[in-house]
């Protein structure tokens, strides 16, 4: 079984490309916080490359934007290609089947944090 569910923030707006027969692809990176802090007491994140096709890509194009907290369900895909130097580059991506809204945007989170601090 190849199934993955991730929750994180979009690092930038999805990049939309169009293929044959008006078939669109949405590509974006999801910053997923690790469940622990590093030695300096800071949270680190993994940056996961994601791609959505067809209806899932249309959803991403219409609704997703930088800073949004979302969850995704999909499958991990690995691949490889040869770069300009002739080296083999290995890739790991998530092929997104579904998107889920989970909360606010980064801007809204900052506003809420400012409100909490001003109440203290």
Language model: regions and residue ranges:
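Beta-rich strand-turn-strand
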Residues: 53-89
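OB-fold and OB-like beta-barrel modules that bind single-stranded nucleic acids
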Residues: 5-12, 30, 66-77, 96-99
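Short edge beta-strand segments in beta-sheet-rich domains
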Residues: 25, 45, 87-96
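Short aromatic-glycine-enriched beta-strand elements
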Residues: 18-32, 90-91
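Ser/Thr-centric signal marking residues that sit
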Residues: 11, 17, 78, 91-92
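Acidic, gly/ser/pro-rich intrinsically disordered tails
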Residues: 1-2, 14-22, 37-43, 58, ...
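Intrinsic-disorder/low-complexity, polar/charged segments enriched in Ser/Thr/Lys/Arg/Asp/Glu/Gln
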Residues: 3-5, 25, 47
């Amino acid at each position: 079984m190849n199934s993955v569910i991730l929750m994180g923030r979009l690092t930038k707006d999805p990049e939309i490309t169009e293929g044959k027969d008006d078939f669109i692809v949405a590509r974006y990176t999801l910053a997923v916080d690790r469940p622990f802090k590093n030695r300096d007491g800071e949270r680190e994140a993994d940056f996961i490359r994601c791609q959505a096709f067809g209806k899932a890509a249309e959803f991403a194009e219409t609704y997703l934007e930088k800073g949004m907290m979302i969850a995704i369900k999909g499958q991990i895909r690995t691949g490889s290609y040869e770069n300009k130097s002739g080296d083999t580059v290995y890739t790991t991506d998530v092929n997104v089947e579904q998107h889920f809204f989970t909360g606010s945007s980064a801007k809204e989170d900052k506003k809420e944090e400012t409100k909490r601090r001003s109440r203290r």
